[in-house]
Amino acid sequence: MAFFVTCFYNQIIRMGECTDMYHKRINIFPNDFMFGAATSAFQVEGAAKEKGRGLAIHERKKKVAGICDFSVASDHFHHLDEDVALMKELGLNAYRFSISWTRILPDGKTLNEQGFEFYDELIDKLLEANIEPLVTIYHFEYPQALVDEYGGWLSKKSIDDYLLLATSLFERYKTKVKYWISINEQDHIVKIVDRLGVSSEIAGMEYENIAQIANYHMCIAVAKANELCHKIIPGAIIGPAVNPMPALAATSNAKDAVAAMEFEELNYCYLLDLYCRGEYSPFYLKYLADRNIILEINEEDMEVIKANPPDFIGINYYMSQTIVANNDNQISLRGKDVVTSETGIYDIVLNKHIEQSTWGWPICSEGITLSIAKIYNRYHLPMMITENGLGAHDEVTNGAIADDYRINYLQDHLSQIKNCLGLGYPIIGYCAWSLIDLVSGREGMDKRYGFIYVNRDNEDLRDLKRIKKKSFYWYQKVISERGERL
């Protein structure tokens, strides 16, 4: 790994420099840096009942009035040729997508040959277009049958279920796929009840205990998948995608700085400590013990996790958070959500210096620099930006979408990444979220992220026509120029 980092840094230095910042800034991105875009299966594919696909847990969720479900989504399943042609026109070096677990294993146990066919075709078309496939094994989509049978991730049997999926993919695509993402945002899976598949009536300490059991099983499964991946595909690179939210102390009060640190420990560091070091941090163990959350840790399991760290860390970056200390002299459970205050530790507050998106997400491009630096300095692994984007209401005017707000967001974040490369941080690539408009988990088609507009809304499928947004042409130019103007 040290050799990789040294070679990477030397390549950066040789690329040419300019000096418009406090450090020497590179002119262009490295030749092997991958400019990509990302989607996930359940949000983009559609074809929910075709080719033997089984029921996934998100399909049991009660439909919200005015928000579409995932049954058709962007209908990528039936627009494959057109969508790959658009990727090629955009100039992508890489495309990150996920596998629908229930296409491959409809009941979680039995392989479905028809389910592979879509991915066979997609991967072949990507390779023909000189686009590197980046495959996410598990992105929120979990077989309902496994939850019904024994609680899914709450049972240790779930580890073998995941490994069956992973092994089938490694064997099938071992000559075609080099880059693998083992799991997407595990922290979100265990904190959002419908992504874990348990009853929404379970709450408080009972839910926290369940979440920790599931989290433990996922970490074992991911470690074993790392081992299998290297055994089946010796040249492969595999790692998880996490969602860091770097914390800014709201004031110069040292208590706020400590609270900000503790927010990050509970947000993502506890999970990366498990992935990369095979251990629970003292802070996290004390946090659980104070809340009477009992962990039954098996020494052999921890040895497996420690022996099989990832090759890289995927970073899904969207926002920072601003933190003040919460001085209440009591302990409470934070509830079932990803972003919430924690009584006795911290509160999340608005930052007057940081703009917010339509959905109240802080827009802080410097946060991606903080994430890259903190993660590398703590874990010393190469990184890939696996998601980054702006969700917004997009309007079609005279057949065009002028999404300058998205261009500004992406430009600021890519500029920060360019600075990080100049500082020598090993970043493999960047995948914007998203390639194409897709169904957002809570806002449906109201919240759009894509470079490509899909002509549908929450109530009307319309014609699902693809329309290139202004940001499409902007990103196309960024890629062709290797980011020279960023």
Where are these regions (language model features)?
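Active-site region of glycoside hydrolase catalytic domains
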Residues: 20-64, 108-109, 117-486
